[in-house]
């Protein structure tokens, strides 16, 4: 059987302004810490197989799943990252600068939680999926992460969907 948990880490809505805004200038840091802590708590539950704890996400969720399997490589054994942001320097500046300011103003915020910079920490199974026509999270994010993983001699799986956009929809597309 399967157990599925949906975690609302710091930065999500419905828990007050301080909880929602605490990720400002450090996207990924607190959220990944919370996801890793939640997975570690789940691992203490009697029906959870600690050797098979996975995480998956799409877009920002892909950013989180790729970061979590690298930062939380002692708890997550598998991750699926679909259309992941792997470094905010490659993402839409209107969105990014609203939450992170510019790279010149917040270099540590950009670098410290970029999955690219954690690639050498990968231990488990990672599947990365991306459409080449994604105009939201450009496929460069995936290509750069793949290059870092190769340079770190890490095994991973990758599925590239030619001419598919951010939703990877249409034709015989399957994930």
Role assignments for model-derived ranges:
Residues 132-135, 163-165:
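Acidic beta-to-alpha connecting loop that harbors the catalytic carboxylate
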Residues 122, 128-130, 134:
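Short beta-strand/loop motif that positions the catalytic acidic residue
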Residues 127, 143, 150-175:
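C-terminal catalytic histidine-bearing segment of alpha/beta-hydrolase fold enzymes
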Residues 135-144:
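Conserved alpha/beta-hydrolase "acid-adjacent" motif
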Residues 62-74:
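Short glycine-enriched nucleophile-adjacent loop
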Residues 1-60, 86-87, 91-97:
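Cap/lid segment of the alpha/beta-hydrolase catalytic domain
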Residues 22, 34, 77-78, 84-124, ...:
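Mobile cap/lid helix-loop segments that gate and shape the active-site cleft of serine hydrolases
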